[in-house]
Each structure stands twice: as structure tokens, then as C-alpha cells.
């Protein structure tokens, strides 16, 4: 709710009907809000001093963090909307990154989204991220 006591439009549920099913642990681990649950993304952790230094060479916005999570979209594995050919890899990766950030916040830690980076330089610094 906002300060006026009204719900934010983005928070309102978009689900109109629910089915009652028991949720198993393995099923819960696989659930993700991605297009048809394709999960076309990968997450890399940059934590060593060397990795953090290489990452800092790709952006001016590291804010002294000691760990970085790089979320990459896998276009070849994503759902593509048939009406217009729209590939949802970037949307799905953004959803995953947002949920990771919410989980980090839930642990009492902070995070920030950094979109201003040199993508070709990042690929050069971390060739294992290719593909």
C-alpha cells in the first residue's frame, strides 16, 4: 500500500484462478516466473579479487562491492512469441535478477542493478560467459 492506503497497480495479482495442488520441494525449486518456465538465463558469480578487478574494468559503477552476480540471457533457449517473433530471454533474465535482488534484500543485505557496462569488454574479461 502507498501512503494513501491504496494498493499499487503493479502489486495487484494478475492470477484470476488458482488450482489446489500440493507443492513438492523439487517443484518449488524449479518454479520461476519466466515465459513458459524456460528459464533462459545463467548466473555467474564474480567474487575473487582477480574477478572483481576484471569486472571493474568494464564499468565505473562497482561501488566497492566484494561480490558480483552477472545474469546473462540465453536467447537460443528462450520462448519466442509467435505473433511478432519477440524473444523473451532478456525479460526472463531481468525477472530472475530482480528475484535474486529481492532474496538478497530479504537476507538483510543490499544490492544494486548495474546496466551501464561495456558488454564486449565483459565478454573479453570473462570468456567462460560466452554462450
Language model: regions and residue ranges:
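Small-aliphatic-rich amphipathic alpha-helix that forms the alpha element of a beta-alpha
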Residues: 29-30, 69, 77, 84-125
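Short coil/turn connectors at secondary-structure junctions
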Residues: 63-67, 109, 130-131
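Short, glycine/charged-enriched secondary-structure capping and boundary segments
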Residues: 58-60, 84-85, 127-129
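Detector for methionine-enriched segments
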Residues: 1, 101, 128-129
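Generic, low-specificity signal for short hydrophobic/alpha-helical stretches with a mild N-terminal bias
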Residues: 5-8, 37, 51, 82, ...
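N-terminal amphipathic, basic helical "cap/leader" segment at the start of enzyme domains
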Residues: 1-67, 73-76
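Short, intrinsically disordered, charge-balanced linker/junction segments flanking boundaries
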Residues: 20-27, 123-131
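A short, mixed-charge helix-start or loop-turn motif at secondary-structure junctions
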Residues: 12-13, 82-86
Amino acid at each position: 500500500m502507498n501512503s494513501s492506503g491504496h494498493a499499487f497497480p503493479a502489486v495487484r495479482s494478475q492470477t484470476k484462478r488458482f488450482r489446489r495442488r500440493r507443492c513438492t520441494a523439487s517443484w518449488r525449486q524449479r518454479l520461476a516466473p519466466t515465459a513458459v518456465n524456460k528459464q533462459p538465463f545463467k548466473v555467474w558469480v564474480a567474487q575473487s579479487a582477480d574477478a572483481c578487478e576484471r569486472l571493474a574494468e568494464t564499468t565505473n559503477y562497482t561501488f566497492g562491492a566484494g561480490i558480483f552476480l552477472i545474469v546473462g540471457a540465453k536467447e537460443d533457449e528462450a520462448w519466442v512469441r509467435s505473433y511478432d517473433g519477440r524473444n523473451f530471454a532478456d525479460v526472463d533474465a531481468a525477472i530472475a535478477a530482480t528475484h535474486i535482488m529481492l532474496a538478497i534484500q530479504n537476507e538483510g543485505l543490499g544490492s544494486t542493478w548495474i546496466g551501464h557496462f561495456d558488454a564486449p569488454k565483459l565478454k573479453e574479461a570473462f570468456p567462460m560467459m560466452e554462450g
